[in-house]
């Protein structure tokens, strides 16, 4: 934390329901381990927990068609799409043709179907050059899942309401999709690292105080690998997801923070993510409290399918969490960057650095949340360094 370019950062780890690591650091006193930070796509794993709770109640299965619960979704040829395909990023809805108004994302407006109407009239699009149908739904998956969730949930709640009432309050954590007015002051705003800084700092050798994880040549190689992937995507050239968005700092806007974008705009902290992850690593239970029953937990982690998603090959379960597995001699460099150091973990990570993952075999709950966003570190290898060290510690403990 002291050697890399960090403004404020948090790291928390649970092992067998016990908090064993609780670190945070900042350049000023305005930051604390309980500060709220946008964890971006780490929120995707929270939306999977919400949906799994419906499976546990016998209200849906992942093999069901979305139109079983939301008939209007079938417009424009989407009638056969299953919940599992949506959760595995295979819905063909990775980006929308228009930008959404942040006011439409407020909980009360979601319940008026402001977002649902847009999704209903949207057509599916898959990569122009064919191949795998899996394409990362960076922002859109959460909007669609929220519409499915609220139509099935007995009280008609949104994901944001479920997380507050069924996860946040009983577990004593912050799992916030839709920040309330009185919570805005708790936020620590995200700060993207400028590309100029990234470029010049990467030219330094480590012994001269380089504050980036990778040197210039490593960064250049990673960027060059991603260019053809980006160009062969359905998101290339599409509008920004939000009206008025001019860059990543737009995520600091209160109007956006107060709306529900579960896949890209969840506010939490490392302590909370690690505790939720500890619950998930223990089969959906924490200190005798059950948050997901066995049927829900098992279904969420079942039916893993490997496919190319642009950033190398990924394994996603039917419930929508990634499973990180050991690599072999034939694995690509991207596959190794994605998996090595995370073997056995489930979950996901967020733009610029955050990680929210759990390891059922070793019963590890892991949460890492920085405010300094390294947008070039696409696979969150900065935080993976801590994950690898946690695995090393567990290995030494079990010898």
Predicted regions and their residues:
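Short, gly/Ser/Thr-rich active-site loops of penicillin-recognizing serine hydrolases
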Residues: 282-285, 301-308, 376-399
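Active-site Gly/Thr loop motif
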Residues: 193-270, 298, 302-361
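Non-transmembrane alpha-helical segments in soluble domains
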Residues: 52, 67, 84-88, 116, ...
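Short, well-structured active-site flanking segments
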Residues: 20, 34, 46, 53-71, ...
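Active-site-proximal loop and beta-strand segments within enzyme catalytic domains
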Residues: 5, 28-143, 147
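A short, well-structured edge-of-sheet supersecondary motif
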Residues: 1-31, 62, 103, 356-359, ...
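Short, charged, amphipathic alpha-helices and their helix-cap/turn boundaries
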Residues: 18, 23, 103-129, 157-174, ...
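Active-site-proximal alpha-helical segments within enzyme catalytic domains
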Residues: 89, 141-148, 264-286, 354-371
């Amino acid at each position: 934390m002291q050697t890399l370019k960090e403004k404020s950062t948090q790291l928390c780890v649970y092992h067998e329901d016990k908090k064993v690591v609780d670190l945070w650091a900042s350049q000023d006193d305005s930051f604390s381990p309980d500060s709220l930070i946008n964890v971006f796509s780490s929120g995707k794993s929270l939306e999977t927990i919400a949906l799994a709770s419906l499976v546990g109640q016998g209200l849906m299965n992942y093999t069901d068609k979305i139109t079983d619960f939301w008939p209007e979704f079938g417009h424009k040829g989407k009638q056969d799409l299953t919940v599992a395909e949506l959760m595995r990023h295979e819905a063909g809805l990775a980006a929308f043709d228009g930008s959404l108004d942040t006011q439409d994302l407020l909980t009360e407006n979601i319940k008026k179907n402001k977002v649902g109407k847009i999704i209903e009239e949207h057509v599916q699009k898959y990569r122009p050059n064919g191949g795998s149908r899996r394409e990362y739904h960076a922002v859109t998956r959460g909007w669609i899942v929220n519409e499915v969730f609220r139509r099935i949930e007995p009280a008609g709640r949104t994901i944001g309401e479920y997380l507050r009432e069924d996860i946040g309050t009983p577990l004593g954590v912050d799992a916030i999709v839709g920040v309330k007015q009185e919570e805005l002051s708790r936020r620590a705003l995200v700060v993207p690292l400028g590309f100029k800084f990234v470029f010049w700092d990467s030219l330094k050798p480590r012994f001269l105080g380089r504050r980036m994880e990778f040197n210039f040549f490593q960064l250049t190689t990673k960027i060059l690998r991603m260019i053809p992937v980006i160009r062969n995507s359905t998101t290339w050239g599409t509008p920004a997801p939000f009206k008025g968005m001019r860059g990543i700092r737009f995520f600091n806007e209160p109007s956006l923070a107060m709306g529900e974008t579960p896949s890209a705009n969840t506010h939490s902290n490392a302590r909370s993510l690690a505790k939720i992850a500890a619950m998930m690593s223990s089969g959906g239970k924490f200190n005798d409290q059950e948050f997901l029953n066995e049927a829900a937990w098992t279904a969420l982690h079942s039916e893993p399918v490997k496919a190319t998603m642009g950033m190398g090959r990924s394994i996603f379960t039917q419930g929508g969490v990634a499973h990180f597995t050991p690599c072999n001699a034939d694995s690509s460099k991207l596959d190794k960057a994605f998996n090595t150091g995370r073997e056995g973990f489930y979950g996901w990570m967020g733009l610029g650095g955050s990680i929210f993952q759990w390891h059922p075999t070793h019963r590890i709950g892991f949460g890492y949340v920085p405010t300094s966003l390294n947008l070039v570190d696409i696979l969150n290898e900065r935080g993976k360094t801590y994950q690898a060290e946690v695995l090393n510690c567990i290995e030494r403990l079990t010898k």
